[in-house]
Amino acid sequence: MNFETVIGLEVHVELKTNSKIFSSAPAHFGAEPNSNTNVVDWSYPGVLPVMNKGALEFGMKAALALNCEISKETHFDRKNYFYPDNPKAYQISQFDQPIGHDGWIEIEVEGKKKKIRIERVHLEEDAGKNIHGTDGYSYVDLNRQGTPLIEIVSEADMRSPEEAYAYLEALRSIIQFTEVSDVKMEEGSMRCDANISLRPYGQEEFGTKAELKNLNSMNFVKKGLAYEEKRQAKVLLSGGEIQQETRRFDEATSTTLLMRVKEGSSDYRYFPEPDVPRFSIDDEWIEKVRASLPEMPASRRARYISELGLPEYDAMVLTLTKEMSDFFEATLANGADAKQASNWLMGEVSAYLNSEKVELADTKLTPENLAGMITLINDGTISSKIAKKVFKELIENGGDAKEVVEAKGLVQLSDPAQLLPMINEVLDNNQQSIDDFKNGKDRAVGFLVGQIMKATRGQANPGVVNKLLQEELSKR
């Protein structure tokens, strides 16, 4: 029997506000444990939460970017559960009236585009963090407690781990462009839980789902879902039943392990939060937030294709992250050709970032310097081969491209008066290659060009070398 995979994702995104959602404590990553807290975060008796308007508007902004409808009337609820990192024994969240609902985003997998529906976007506060020490004690850090979150809940529209990965890529890109979050999974500002079930092809009713946690990267999401897909199929084919449960992804083995039997919403005993008033959102407020939205990735992609003439693949890669897209735009603003800038960013720049595991902002490369280097290639000052040496210097140490070329003596040799003596010396030492050329063996020219480039340490202009070489060969 063949099964259809059904996947839905719940993505938590930390909002990049200066303070927390219900307290005035800072909401910054990386501080000393329990240094970004106050009495609200510690849940002292008698203290009351105060809604952060900026967090609310960030939530609206994200929901609008995800094509959601904004709820005109909304409120917060208490989600009751006990855990050491949750001093109130409840979380302030939204249950039946989320800030946004009925949205969608478009993904593309293997050339096929598909809309993934978004059920809801709701606001909530984050919990603290438990730290289990090697001394046998567990510690609680409440810096994260009260950090504003949005939870983005998709419909179960994805049918493969690859579609789930594409959805996360598209979602991360959209949220990055809104600038409400930096969506860094490695820092915990974007976290994903996945729900997966199988059903026989043709069956409308969903199968019993498992929820996957500890998915700390997009690759782990894909690996966890791929394993769970196989595990559930094996259980069903052997006549067993899938249990509704929560499972943890094990990074070492790329498998999923049972954590607990899955709770339902009734286990959390939701009820309206009495300490945070209900609030209304009118059309004027919605349109004000909508007007603050920047150009979204899909719009930029379309512009790159229609106005700049870039291939669809280039446009897609350049808009995967706001950082790369903004860098590309700034490089063009400094006079670079669009296709050349795209090639460098997708090629040498991306390769360097991947190998060094850094982001563009961590390097010394600037749009001005990249554009300057491209100009030097186009005016013949340096060759593409020399440009790679210049690029390495620019991205590691910075500086002006022209100054780097001059300081390191990398200017391309194009003067016939300089090149002809070297060309003739190579010809004098390679009579066999001359004979091969005269006998119609074209590869002899390639060999001779290689020898000339070697003699000039790669600094000769290949076009000029070819022209002069052909002229000299005709004389012999």
From Swiss-Prot:
GO terms for molecular function: asparaginyl-tRNA synthase (glutamine-hydrolyzing) activity; ATP binding; glutaminyl-tRNA synthase (glutamine-hydrolyzing) activity. Disulfide bonds: none annotated. It comes from the Bacteria. The keyword Nucleotide-binding applies. Keywords: ATP-binding, Ligase, Nucleotide-binding, Protein biosynthesis. It is an enzyme of class 6 (ligase). GO terms for biological process: glutaminyl-tRNAGln biosynthesis via transamidation; translation. It catalyses: L-glutamyl-tRNA(Gln) + L-glutamine + ATP + H2O = L-glutaminyl-tRNA(Gln) + L-glutamate + ADP + phosphate + H(+); L-aspartyl-tRNA(Asn) + L-glutamine + ATP + H2O = L-asparaginyl-tRNA(Asn) + L-glutamate + ADP + phosphate + 2 H(+). Its EC number is 6.3.5.-. InterPro entries: Asn/Gln-tRNA_amidoTrfase_suB/E (IPR017959), Asn/Gln-tRNA_Trfase_suB/E_cat (IPR006075), Asn/Gln_amidotransferase (IPR018027), Asn/Gln_tRNA_amidoTrase-B-like (IPR003789), GatB (IPR004413), GatB_C_1 (IPR042114), GatB_Yqey_C_2 (IPR023168), Gln-tRNA_amidoTrfase_suB_CS (IPR017958). Pfam families: GatB_N (PF02934), GatB_Yqey (PF02637). The keyword Kinase does not apply. Heterotrimer of A, B and C subunits. Belongs to the GatB/GatE family. GatB subfamily. Allows the formation of correctly charged Asn-tRNA(Asn) or Gln-tRNA(Gln) through the transamidation of misacylated Asp-tRNA(Asn) or Glu-tRNA(Gln) in organisms which lack either or both of asparaginyl-tRNA or glutaminyl-tRNA synthetases. The reaction takes place in the presence of glutamine and ATP through an activated phospho-Asp-tRNA(Asn) or phospho-Glu-tRNA(Gln). This is Aspartyl/glutamyl-tRNA(Asn/Gln) amidotransferase subunit B.
